[in-house]
Each structure stands twice: as structure tokens, then as C-alpha cells.
Curated annotation (Swiss-Prot):
Organism: Chloroherpeton thalassium (strain ATCC 35110 / GB-78)
Stated name of the protein: Large ribosomal subunit protein uL14
Known partners and oligomeric status: Part of the 50S ribosomal subunit. Forms a cluster with proteins L3 and L19. In the 70S ribosome, L14 and L19 interact and together make contacts with the 16S rRNA in bridges B5 and B8.
Function: Binds to 23S rRNA. Forms part of two intersubunit bridges in the 70S ribosome.
Cross-referenced PANTHER family: 50S/60S RIBOSOMAL PROTEIN L14/L23, LARGE RIBOSOMAL SUBUNIT PROTEIN UL14M
Superkingdom as given in the UniProt entry: Bacteria
GO molecular function terms attached to this record: large ribosomal subunit rRNA binding; structural constituent of ribosome
Keywords: Ribonucleoprotein, Ribosomal protein, RNA-binding, rRNA-binding
Similarity comment: Belongs to the universal ribosomal protein uL14 family.
Annotated GO biological process: translation
Gene3D superfamilies with a match to the protein in the record: Ribosomal protein L14 (2.40.150.20)
Length: 122
């Protein structure tokens, strides 16, 4: 579960390393985001010469959460870290590579570009 002020890792090569959630998209007063949900983030640390800089505000999709996620078949999935992939204004990934596994729930939410770039879909 991701909420405002949550620090997250960035799972792509857009140049950002750590971001902080500043808003959860999807309705008035929505408090939590989980796998596949879109959030607004602020870049807290970035690599020099990257496409994004510190203090940049961007949209992102959550690809991994520490909090377990219950699937329709009754199984649970959880990861070791909270991670996002930064998106451009068209909703496509800003980076050209994705690091680490992503959940297959992204396929249901039509993030096919992220699924195709990911090294492993769990």
C-alpha cells in the first residue's frame, strides 16, 4: 500500500533513483495505491546526466509493493521493496529498460509496454 509521503525505488533507467509519492490518482480522497495504480511522484535523488532531475514531478505506475497483494485465485504476492516506473504524459515508460520483476496484474491494466520490457513477470 502506497500513500502520500511514501518513498519508493525507481525500477527503470530514466535517471531517477528514489522518488516520493505526492498524490494517489483515481478519485477524490483516495488514500492508498497498490500494484498497477498510477500515482504522482517527486524525484528525490537522480543520477547525473539522466533524463529526469531532482525535484521533477512525474506520473508513475506502481510495479512492486512490500504489502502483500491478494490475487483472484486466493494466492498472495509480495516483493522486497516498493518500486515504480516513471511515465510520460502519454502514459508510456520514460526509460527504455525495466529492472527487477513486475507483477502480472500490470497486463490487466493495459501496461503492455512495461510487461514487454520487464525481465520477469510474476
Amino acid at each position: 500500500m502506497i500513500q502520500k509521503e511514501t518513498d519508493l525505488m525507481v525500477a527503470d533507467n530514466s535517471g531517477a533513483k528514489r522518488v516520493r509519492c505526492i498524490h494517489v490518482l483515481g478519485g477524490t480522497g483516495r488514500r492508498y495505491a497498490t500494484i498497477g495504480d498510477m500515482i504522482v511522484v517527486s524525484v528525490k535523488s537522480a543520477i547525473p546526466g539522466g533524463a529526469v532531475k531532482k525535484k521533477d514531478v512525474s506520473k508513475a505506475v506502481v510495479v512492486r509493493t512490500k504489502k502483500e497483494y491478494r490475487r483472484k485465485d486466493g494466492s498472495y504476492i509480495r516483493f522486497d521493496e516498493n518500486a515504480v516506473v516513471l511515465l510520460n504524459t502519454q502514459g508510456e515508460p520514460r526509460g527504455t529498460r525495466i529492472f527487477g520483476p513486475v507483477a502480472r496484474e500490470l497486463r490487466d491494466k493495459q501496461y503492455m509496454k512495461i510487461i514487454s520490457l520487464a525481465p520477469e513477470v510474476i
